[in-house]
Amino acid sequence: MKIVNSMSRRLMLGAAGAVALSAMAGGAWAENAELKIGFVGVTSGPAAAWGTSNVRSMQTRADWLNETGGVKIGDKIYNITIVTFDDQKDPKRAIAGMEKMAQEGIHYVVGPNVDDGAASVRPVAEAKGIIYFPYAFPKELYTKPASNAVLGMIASYQSGPAIYKYLKENKGVKTIAFVAANESDPLSQRDSGVAAAKALGLEIVADKDTYQNDTRDFTPVLTPIVQLKPDLLVLSGVAPANAPLLIRSARELGFEGLISTETAQDAKVLEEGAGELANGFISVGGASTPEIRSPEMDEFIKRYTEKFGEYNDESNTKVYALEYILDTLKANPKAIDDVAEFKKTMDTFSAPNPFVKGDEVLKYVGMTSFGQKRQVSVPMVVNEYRDGKFETLFVGEVD
């Protein structure tokens, strides 16, 4: 991985994506075939923002494509229908959700959003012929013999080293502390972060402190950490609803260092829960910045905001999964009901990206991390929260 210093040179991907779709709009809407794409993930509870941004991104993009005539795959034109299932961050419900998708004949599913859910649905996906795009980081999901999962975002073990390196070189960070919810997802991210920090030569002053995910008073958890005065406090795998509570507690206890996480966050939730105390909070953002957005991305944000009354920066990343699915199917129409064909196409797949300026392309990556191409390529945007909105700290990439 590397930090990209010139955004004008890097991460400028083609804007041709769905432009041609309007030319395909010939027939009446109702005459198009239907293509169902599934979502199984969390849309309720403390982590709801993660899955909600998925669903809203998919629905906004599907409506837009349908409005412009549908999507041409092979010799057919399809209207896209998004079928959703809230797994409530429960692995058993995630399995039920994936089984529902199989019953409906759906072969391509976005989600789940967390490690437990993504791991639990693997047997169903492999048995029923489903390719799924989790937002979860266990490498065993993406390394052989596994082959049905495609990582839909930048992993914490990819973004963490980049964030720590940047803060070490640019903010003088020398000491670091970690705190995580006592669940497999954040604990795994904490362990990856600790390994990355050690590799960079940072002094780890705390890495065993945990809390229950339903905690609302974080003072007892954070008091011993704040007393150690680390330069950087990492909230490993923190859910969007808990981030402002942790930040507020740390600041009210007198913590003056930097605070970061490798998970995506919601600016509105931070503003409502922590206000100006959240200023300077560093997180992984969506895969877009005002400087690199294409007109198509601006239009997506406009449509999303009009449809739902607000926009979540995380949707800058979540917009990509549906696009990758549809463009890969367009590249090999046989894959529409045969995931083996989809897998064959991934190794050489390349398509214009409608969401950022420039001439780079959508492609599958992951060879370095997984030994096979089982990850979507998106810009790695690292944000700093400031006065109600995210500002770009730096942009990187993963191979």
Where does each model-flagged region fall?
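Extracytosolic ligand-binding ectodomains
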Residues: 2-3, 8, 12-15, 29-399
